[in-house]
């Protein structure tokens, strides 16, 4: 039997696999790339463990895990299957079949639209929203609004990485947790 690995050691390992690309996508930006962690099987398992353990402790009442288009999808299914919960996607406009609700939100370079299938979340269901990154908070604010439109209740927003200097957390109501802060 191998020794148990602490959450801190798991997190350090995941951090070591996150790529850094200066001046991408434009001059002056340091892009942190989660895909480096996802291509490493051990880092991927550790990341799943950290997210699942956090929800077990912080939001045990959760019934649905929602992932945001597109990197949030990489995590919500992993979490939901491990916890035996439902999962639902929030997608960009025009990507979901059936009846949808939508909300527009501001990006630093314009406006975009998120959509959610009306049947994905039942009124009163408790939801954890998962994404890879919290920057300005615009996408998580929009997701929370969208979930509210179908009667869901966001109990927590959970992200892998947070860019603290952009202060996106200040725009969000309710619990917010990030595994890694830059």
From Swiss-Prot:
Q: In which pathway does it act?
A: Purine metabolism; AMP biosynthesis via salvage pathway; AMP from adenine: step 1/1
Q: Which enzyme type, at the first EC level? A: transferase
- Per the UniProt record, which EC number(s) apply here? 2.4.2.7
Q: State the disulfide connectivity.
A: none
Q: Tell me which InterPro entries the record gives.
A: Ade_phspho_trans, PRibTrfase_dom, PRTase-like, UPRTase/APRTase
Name of the gene: Aprt
Supply one GO molecular-function term: adenine phosphoribosyltransferase activity
Q: Name one GO biological process term.
A: adenine salvage
Q: Keyword Cytoplasm: yes or no?
A: yes
Similarity comment: Belongs to the purine/pyrimidine phosphoribosyltransferase family.
Compartments, record wording: Cytoplasm
Quaternary structure note: Homodimer.
Upper classification of the organism: Eukaryota, Metazoa, Ecdysozoa, Arthropoda, Hexapoda
Q: Which reaction does it catalyse?
A: AMP + diphosphate = 5-phospho-alpha-D-ribose 1-diphosphate + adenine
Tell me which GO cellular component terms the UniProt record holds: cytoplasm
* Its biological purpose: Catalyzes a salvage reaction resulting in the formation of AMP, that is energically less costly than de novo synthesis.
Q: By its UniProt entry, which SUPFAM superfamilies does this protein fall under?
A: PRTase-like
Q: What is its main location?
A: cytoplasm
Cross-referenced Pfam families, in alphabetical order? Pribosyltran (PF00156)
Q: Which organism is it from?
A: Drosophila melanogaster
Q: Please provide the record's keywords in A-Z order.
A: Cytoplasm, Glycosyltransferase, Purine salvage, Transferase
Name of the protein this chain belongs to: Adenine phosphoribosyltransferase
């Amino acid at each position: 039997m191998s020794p148990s690995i602490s959450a801190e050691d798991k997190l350090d390992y995941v951090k070591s696999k996150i790529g850094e690309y200066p001046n991408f996508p434009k001059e002056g930006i340091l892009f942190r790339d989660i895909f480096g962690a996802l291509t490493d099987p051990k880092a991927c398992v550790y990341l799943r463990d950290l997210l699942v353990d956090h929800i077990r402790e912080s939001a045990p009442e959760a019934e649905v895990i929602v992932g945001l288009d597109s990197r949030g999808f990489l995590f919500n299914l992993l979490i939901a299957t491990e916890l035996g919960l439902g999962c639902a996607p929030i997608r960009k406009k025009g990507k979901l079949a059936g009846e949808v609700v939508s909300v527009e939100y501001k990006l630093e370079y314009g406006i975009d639209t998120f959509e959610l299938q009306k049947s994905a979340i039942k009124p009163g269901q408790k939801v954890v929203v998962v994404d890879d990154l919290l920057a300005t908070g615009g996408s998580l604010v929009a997701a929370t609004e969208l979930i509210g439109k179908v009667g869901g209740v966001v109990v927590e927003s959970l992200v892998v990485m947070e860019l603290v200097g952009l202060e996106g957390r200040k725009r969000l109501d309710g619990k917010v947790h990030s595994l890694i802060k830059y």
